[in-house]
Amino acid sequence: MPSLRYALVAYIESPVGEFVESLRRELHPSLPHLAAHLTLLPPRPLQGSEAAALQAIERICGQTEPFEVVLGDMKSFIPTTPTVYIPVAQGESRLRELHAQLNTQVLAFAEEWPYVPHVTIVQMATQPAAEQALAIARARWEQYSGSRRILLDRLTFVREDAPNCWVDLAPVSLGGSLVSP
């Protein structure tokens, strides 16, 4: 049995999050649809227990004040992967710092790719499909008139219980401690 994977995300519960979820459904209706989010720690096995991981997350996040990020222009990871995403244009360094602080001890993992703060829109099966999705996504993003700012004040520790089936384990406030769901 493969080991469980865990991640730390910031759900985007705002109009820009609704935009992302709608765009995902438009570009790839057959994919399982995850809530719009920024990933602080990409999926990984733990180097200890869930309880130890939560303690580490709470300690580090408790010392980090909430902050804002601003999303940039639509991009893709082509040719590395056929993925369309929105990078973080402002606040990227804060996310990188927090990622580095969290990617230690029980949460330590040698990630496959360098950490790039972003919101994934969709991962397609092929590069041509991703190029087509990117063109549509750019057009929709240019038409989007809402705020591209996201306040990061709460993160969520999640576990993958089945392929593409993530379960929320615990919300954690920045500048605070575990919060009740």
Predicted segments with their positions:
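Histidine-dependent nucleotide/RNA phosphoesterase domain, centered on the 2H-phosphoesterase fold
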Residues: M1-P181
